[in-house]
């Protein structure tokens, strides 16, 4: 797999176009500010509200989504996945200029045919592999965020446009990898659900609950199962698992080898395959889309339960007393 850098693309391609950023959440703000700082003309498409005010505070003059799209060569859709198809149908599709392209930072709505691409409309994806605030922070720092890019239909014009956009958004410094809408979507969802969010959060809570229910102090359980997680991940992020094992004690490393597979064993791997199958068959997407159409009852209930878990109160209390938790 080839990794592209700034020298492998032409940032002037996107600089010659007007980009409408539709949405001004975490990703929308990062894209808009990075593109502007890279010399791209950016217009913001928003409804009145807090995001509208935030964009104005950042020096933009937001317009309605329809107006922003109608004057743009590229419409980058950065609204939440669950409402993007509705925004596209009502405020984007019929307002695109001839020859304009639709862009995405995640392939969900294209992969699952919520936004059909065709009838002369080209689409590309420039997906930074980090939350929005980190996309902005790494751009400012000069090392950027890795990007995945794709085009539909697959043609050199859209490919070059996607790479150019990724460079302007900071990807040229960190690396740009070509993929497809389907592969980006399926791997992204699996990583979030099985490892980065779903798997990791459940692992932390299970460890915390095991220690507390066995009679250990909640504060000790928090330190061992949550606080130290970042320290471990930072080492792995810099040098991989081998670097981690070089930095820990022989006792910790031996425990990794003999107990890790007991926790993450055959049953977990089988569950991961079932999660991936739900993603690949579209079952998860169908459930998520219906969740959004039903006013998100599962999300609401689960968010409430997360806030009520004992680890949250313990963590908040300890973090308020630790200068290291505040970056000082």
UniProtKB/Swiss-Prot annotation:
Residues at the catalytic site: 106
Cofactor: Mg(2+)
Residue span, KARI C-terminal knotted domain: 180-325
Listed pathway(s): Amino-acid biosynthesis; L-isoleucine biosynthesis; L-isoleucine from 2-oxobutanoate: step 2/4; Amino-acid biosynthesis; L-valine biosynthesis; L-valine from pyruvate: step 2/4
Any Pfam family matching the protein: KARI_N
Residue numbers binding Mg(2+) 2: 188, 224, 228
Domain KARI N-terminal Rossmann stretches: 1-179
Coiled coil: none
Binding residues annotated for substrate, in chain numbering: 249
GO cellular component terms listed in the entry, alphabetical order: cytosol
Main function: Involved in the biosynthesis of branched-chain amino acids (BCAA). Catalyzes an alkyl-migration followed by a ketol-acid reduction of (S)-2-acetolactate (S2AL) to yield (R)-2,3-dihydroxy-isovalerate. In the isomerase reaction, S2AL is rearranged via a Mg-dependent methyl migration to produce 3-hydroxy-3-methyl-2-ketobutyrate (HMKB). In the reductase reaction, this 2-ketoacid undergoes a metal-dependent reduction by NADPH to yield (R)-2,3-dihydroxy-isovalerate.
Protein's name according to its UniProt entry: Ketol-acid reductoisomerase (NADP(+))
Originating organism: Tremblaya princeps
């Amino acid at each position: 797999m080839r990794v592209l850098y700034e020298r492998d693309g032409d940032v002037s391609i996107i600089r010659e176009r007007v980009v409408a950023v539709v949405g001004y959440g975490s990703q929308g703000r990062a894209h808009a500010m990075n593109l502007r700082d890279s010399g791209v003309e950016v217009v913001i498409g928003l409804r009145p509200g807090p995001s509208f005010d935030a964009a104005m505070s950042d020096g933009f003059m937001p317009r309605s989504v329809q107006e922003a799209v109608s004057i743009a060569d590229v419409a980058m859709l950065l609204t939440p996945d669950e409402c993007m198809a509705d925004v596209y149908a009502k405020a984007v599709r019929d307002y695109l200029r001839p020859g304009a392209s639709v862009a995405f930072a995640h392939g969900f709505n294209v992969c699952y045919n919520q936004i059909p691409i065709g009838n002369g409309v080209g689409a590309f994806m420039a997906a930074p592999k980090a939350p929005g605030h980190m996309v902005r922070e790494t751009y400012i720092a000069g090392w950027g965020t890795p990007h995945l890019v794709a085009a539909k239909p697959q043609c050199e014009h859209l490919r070059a446009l996607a790479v150019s956009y990724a460079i302007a958004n900071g990807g040229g410094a960190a690396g740009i990898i070509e993929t497809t809408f389907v592969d980006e979507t399926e791997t992204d969802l699996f990583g979030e659900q099985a490892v980065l969010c779903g798997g990791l959060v459940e692992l932390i809570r299970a460890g915390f609950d095991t220690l507390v229910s066995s009679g250990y102090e909640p504060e000790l359980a928090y330190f061992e199962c949550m606080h130290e997680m970042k320290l471990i991940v930072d080492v792995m992020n810099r040098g991989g698992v081998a670097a981690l094992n070089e930095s820990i004690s022989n006792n910790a490393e031996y425990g990794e080898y003999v107990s890790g597979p007991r926790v993450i064993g055959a049953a977990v791997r089988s569950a991961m395959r079932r999660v991936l199958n739900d993603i690949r068959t579209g079952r998860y997407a169908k459930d998520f889309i219906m969740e959004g159409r039903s006013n998100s009852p599962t999300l609401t209930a689960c968010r409430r339960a997360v806030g009520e878990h004992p680890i949250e109160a313990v963590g908040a209390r300890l973090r308020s007393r630790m200068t290291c938790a505040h970056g000082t």
